[in-house]
Amino acid sequence: MANRKKQGKSKEKDNGWEERVVQVKRVTKVVKGGKKLSFRVILVVGNEQGQVGVGVGKASDVIGAVKKGVTDAKKHLVTVPLTKSNSIPHPINGISGAAQVILRPSAPGSGVIAGGSVRTVLELSGVQNILAKQLGSNNTLNNARAVLNGLTQLRTFSEAAKDRGVPIENLYSK
């Protein structure tokens, strides 16, 4: 599975940000003179070091929609706390609309076990060992946003200890 072909179109930029197109959809708007065609692009931007964002762009051509999507994704960046094994600190659920995503940390070497837009978001965030399951809706955009919702809820051990007002040693089981 390590040699699996990357999903979507990928561009590597010189400043370390990678963008991947998840979905290109041709949409129409009915106006007085007929139907007006445009394109809606869902894409994910990430630096594979703990920052990731999902953006949507609409324009009359695909290239313009991608540019708008990149700026939208960079406006909605999320920072992900990664562990030493490039996983997440604890299991979490993310919800967006009717889409629900379960994210669970996994053992080193297991890889990203997820599908669709969930996989793309997790890979570009820098997570390398994780189990993810989509529940409810199969909507691409809502599943990507559900992952972001889950990733924003993650807390490290030090943050949890600080919130509870106890030393970090008390959080570890004896």
From Swiss-Prot:
Keywords: Chloroplast, Plastid, Ribonucleoprotein, Ribosomal protein, RNA-binding, rRNA-binding
GO molecular function: rRNA binding; structural constituent of ribosome
Protein location: Plastid, Chloroplast
InterPro entries reported in the protein's UniProt record: Ribosomal_Su5_D2-typ_SF, Ribosomal_uS5, Ribosomal_uS5_bac-type, Ribosomal_uS5_C, Ribosomal_uS5_N, Ribosomal_uS5_N_CS, Ribsml_uS5_D2-typ_fold_subgr
Pfam families: Ribosomal_S5, Ribosomal_S5_C
The organism's place on the tree of life at top rank: Eukaryota
Functional description taken from the UniProt entry: With S4 and S12 plays an important role in translational accuracy.
Domain notes: The N-terminal domain interacts with the head of the 30S subunit; the C-terminal domain interacts with the body and contacts protein S4. The interaction surface between S4 and S5 is involved in control of translational fidelity.
Entry similarity comment: Belongs to the universal ribosomal protein uS5 family.
Subunit structure: Part of the 30S ribosomal subunit. Contacts protein S4.
Classification via PANTHER family: MITOCHONDRIAL RIBOSOMAL PROTEIN S5
NCBIfam families in UniProt: rpsE_bact
Protein name per the record: Small ribosomal subunit protein uS5c
Gene, per the UniProt record: rps5
